[in-house]
Regions:
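Thioredoxin-like thiol-disulfide oxidoreductase module
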Residues: 34-52, 78-85
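Local sequence-structure signature of Cys/Sec-based thiol-disulfide redox active-site neighborhoods
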Residues: 1-30
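Structural micro-motif
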Residues: 49-58, 68
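Short, glycine/charged-enriched secondary-structure capping and boundary segments
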Residues: 20-22, 45, 71-73
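Non-catalytic, surface beta->alpha helical segment in thiol-disulfide oxidoreductase systems
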Residues: 59-85
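Structural signal for short hydrophobic segments within the conserved structured cores
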Residues: 30-32, 62
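Loop/helix-junction capping segments adjacent to catalytic residues or to phosphate/diphosphate-binding pockets
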Residues: 15, 38, 73
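Conserved short-loop catalytic and cofactor-binding motifs
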Residues: 10, 32, 45, 67
Length: 85
């Protein structure tokens, strides 16, 4: 399974949903909280092509996007393959 990194904020319901889906899939992930951390937010945005909303999810070298993007991948049947790569 490729490394998974998810940038989050503690009060973000979409972050919790994305983490729940990854847990349901049995995927271990590194969570990076950007709560009040401008340097972490800037690093996330730079890595995510300027997107500054959370969550931002990376599977291996691929930027998946946010929570809706993760669920769209799952709904299309492509998330399991990405997690197994």
């Amino acid at each position: 399974m490729p490394p998974i990194v998810i940038y989050t904020k503690s009060s973000c319901p979409y972050c919790h949903s994305a983490k729940d889906l990854l847990r349901q899939k049995g995927a271990a992930f590194e969570e990076i909280s950007v709560d009040g951390d401008r340097a972490a937010q800037a690093a996330m945005a730079a890595k995510a092509g300027g997107r500054s909303t959370v969550p931002q999810i990376f599977i291996g070298a691929e930027h998946v996007g946010g929570c809706d993007d993760l669920y769209d991948l799952d709904g299309a049947g492509r998330l399991d393959a990405l997690l197994a790569a």
